[in-house]
């Protein structure tokens, strides 16, 4: 059989048994070489088993400019014209071979040469094609610009032939074809070839549901090397209208390419063309567009686009990734209730939670929007759908949500469940949650549970965990527990980081422990970390605490060099420095020099203006803050309301207006939650100044109205825990009304908060494995914390002659470990005298003020009794002259009555009683004699 006969036989078989090997639609014409091409055909395929991948073509030399390709060549029967069929008319293969167009010659030559190998599988056939290209380039390097078109046409024909015979191949095999085409410099032809691949050949390639397409990296390379991809994509939709699915894949991939690169304007244009012109709205494309808008912080536009899309394709509302985006919008933006409502509606319509991620994000959103009542029902719904598939992350999200709500009962319950049902491998992350919620961190019981489990399960901790623990205990001012946990982690080999040293220094500054401050300052200097950002900020705070201007100037220089992001903090410290120095006008001057003041700066300025009684300036400051778009926080609300309350009746009206404007129900959850205000005392403190002012003015009706507003808020918002200032203000209100029952309720509330927050932590039982708990007591920093509250309540009890209850409550506080200051001790003596208990009053004077130990503390160098008496009669005496005068008056009355009632109601003659005082406590006797 001759060679020509074999070719004719193959041609006839091919022509009548397969689809025609032409492009179904015309391609654009590429300029041909002016000179003719010659090939040495005998050099081709000397080795039929040649390996592919031998083409070495520089891609930058063969880039094409799509904008130069403007017209599709019209069909012509003139074989000398390098045009392609635009109808069913076809140009025979022999005419291509005899064409004067070099591009057609290369294509005809390759097709003529490789037709016999169409029966091979894809990879062997690709090897033949690559070998052919290599030999052709060796024979004539000038044809490299014609090879991509020929390569594309050849594989288009091959794919059509194979598809008609139910041949399938994998995406990995097809990707090798496209990579070779890219190496030849045919990025545009990659997209042409993809648009022509029969769907049956590899269904995976036309899946628009995922952005992670098998050819994604290849498409990215093409989009980078094509000068105008949008024009080419439009052209493909015209050339291959039947390849609608493939074209949608290309559009979606280009959309992903644009959004990843940040070309949002082009992305919007392309999506609009997909959505309006071609009516494509795949889940992936919609998600890409919403994501791109979210990255630009265009939350309202993203929500608007979502609404338009689901109006056309309601099923998109159930897509878990788009749902997650909506919940993300609702949690990160200042206020996006629309996004949250849409997400909730979609979840409600589907009657199920679609994924773990959506559930976790949903927990955060519920906390933010103060819908804590929905948390547990949704947890039950999740439980029903996933059948107890509680992963560590899910348990973490549930406990986090409850932590942000301050719901201690359910926190403990779900944490215990996590121990049984799941290995809570991310247990240490909960410590960070507790740090963000002072409701939980001040209670500290759950912190101890976590530390116990960290030790029991031998979970590895890091420097960040140490910093969190130090911060939690320093916030409670429990220095013993803080030092104990620091030592415990250090013994485990955890290094004390710069942030940890800063946290320790912060704690000792707060506790005013001069000795420990100097100790850690020495360590910091020896380590050479004084210019660390976190350390420098604590040194600023130390300078503020000591009113050390030189140290503050040194810190300022360091901050200007190394802490550009800390300029706001520096301005805050400088303003507070001037405020403490009573240089209020200088503080305002610093504020006016800040280019973009934050809410803290506004709060300090409001406090200063309130102290200066400048109501007009305070109103202007409020307007400026609104005009700059600064949303009020809990701190700014307290600052403005308190400052307004100091301006008399007119200021009180402004305070009421300001609070009613900013304390709307839909704003409360944004203002008062553990994320926006670490100190949960802000919500009640907001009401404290108002209740106090209305009560002092005698406007009981308004005071009750403010109190009822808070109680309504408190009953619906478990994130807010009453603090002591609020309870004192409320108790003072009911004391003024002589309401014993409600006054007692608020007093009990004060003690409840105190027992929760002011009692020492039994840290030794955790780190030392002690089964016997250590005796608890009041944290030293809080020993005198209840003096103001006690004075208010005890004065009320004395005014209504409830001396028995006063004695009980006084003893109750002493048993808890709280201490009374000298002022309260003097009042206690007066109350005893009111109750006609002279003997008890005299004994208290001796035990509290005139014991040898107290005299030694007060007058270390006392040389005689006269000097002691002189001190106690001076203005510096802790025993007030008014107290001594009341004692002397009571004794004079006893002299007139001729007897004194002592313990157990026994009556003693006054003369004998005075002799006893002179014998047992001569100093007191002589002191009273001189009054």
Swiss-Prot record:
<feature type="repeat" description="PPR 3">
    <location>
        <begin position="429"/>
        <end position="461"/>
    </location>
</feature>
<keyword id="KW-0648">Protein biosynthesis</keyword>
<keyword id="KW-0010">Activator</keyword>
<dbReference type="GO" id="GO:0070134">
    <property type="term" value="P:positive regulation of mitochondrial translational initiation"/>
</dbReference>
<feature type="repeat" description="PPR 6">
    <location>
        <begin position="598"/>
        <end position="632"/>
    </location>
</feature>
<dbReference type="GO" id="GO:0003729">
    <property type="term" value="F:mRNA binding"/>
</dbReference>
<dbReference type="GO" id="GO:0099616">
    <property type="term" value="C:extrinsic component of matrix side of mitochondrial inner membrane"/>
</dbReference>
<dbReference type="GO" id="GO:0140053">
    <property type="term" value="P:mitochondrial gene expression"/>
</dbReference>
<dbReference type="InterPro" id="IPR002885">
    <property type="entry name" value="Pentatricopeptide_rpt"/>
</dbReference>
<feature type="repeat" description="PPR 7">
    <location>
        <begin position="683"/>
        <end position="713"/>
    </location>
</feature>
<dbReference type="InterPro" id="IPR011990">
    <property type="entry name" value="TPR-like_helical_dom_sf"/>
</dbReference>
<feature type="repeat" description="PPR 2">
    <location>
        <begin position="282"/>
        <end position="316"/>
    </location>
</feature>
<feature type="repeat" description="PPR 5">
    <location>
        <begin position="497"/>
        <end position="531"/>
    </location>
</feature>
<dbReference type="GO" id="GO:0048027">
    <property type="term" value="F:mRNA 5'-UTR binding"/>
</dbReference>
<dbReference type="GO" id="GO:0045182">
    <property type="term" value="F:translation regulator activity"/>
</dbReference>
<dbReference type="Pfam" id="PF01535">
    <property type="entry name" value="PPR"/>
</dbReference>
<keyword id="KW-0810">Translation regulation</keyword>
<feature type="repeat" description="PPR 4">
    <location>
        <begin position="462"/>
        <end position="496"/>
    </location>
</feature>
<feature type="repeat" description="PPR 1">
    <location>
        <begin position="247"/>
        <end position="277"/>
    </location>
</feature>
<keyword id="KW-0809">Transit peptide</keyword>
<comment type="function">
    <text>RNA-binding translation activation factor that as part of the MRH5C complex specifically recruits cox1 mRNA to the mitochondrial ribosome for translation initiation.</text>
</comment>
<keyword id="KW-0694">RNA-binding</keyword>
<dbReference type="GO" id="GO:0005739">
    <property type="term" value="C:mitochondrion"/>
</dbReference>
<comment type="subunit">
    <text>Component of the MRH5C complex, composed of mrh5, ppr4, mtf2, and sls1. Proteins mtf2 and sls1 form a subcomplex that serves as a scaffold to bring mrh5 and ppr4 together. The MRH5C complex associates with the small subunit of the mitochondrial ribosome.</text>
</comment>
<keyword id="KW-0677">Repeat</keyword>
<keyword id="KW-0496">Mitochondrion</keyword>
<dbReference type="GO" id="GO:0032543">
    <property type="term" value="P:mitochondrial translation"/>
</dbReference>
<dbReference type="GO" id="GO:0005737">
    <property type="term" value="C:cytoplasm"/>
</dbReference>
<dbReference type="GO" id="GO:0070124">
    <property type="term" value="P:mitochondrial translational initiation"/>
</dbReference>
<protein>
    <recommendedName>
        <fullName>Mitochondrial cox1 translation regulator ppr4</fullName>
    </recommendedName>
</protein>
<dbReference type="GO" id="GO:0008494">
    <property type="term" value="F:translation activator activity"/>
</dbReference>
<feature type="transit peptide" description="Mitochondrion">
    <location>
        <begin position="1"/>
        <end position="16"/>
    </location>
</feature>
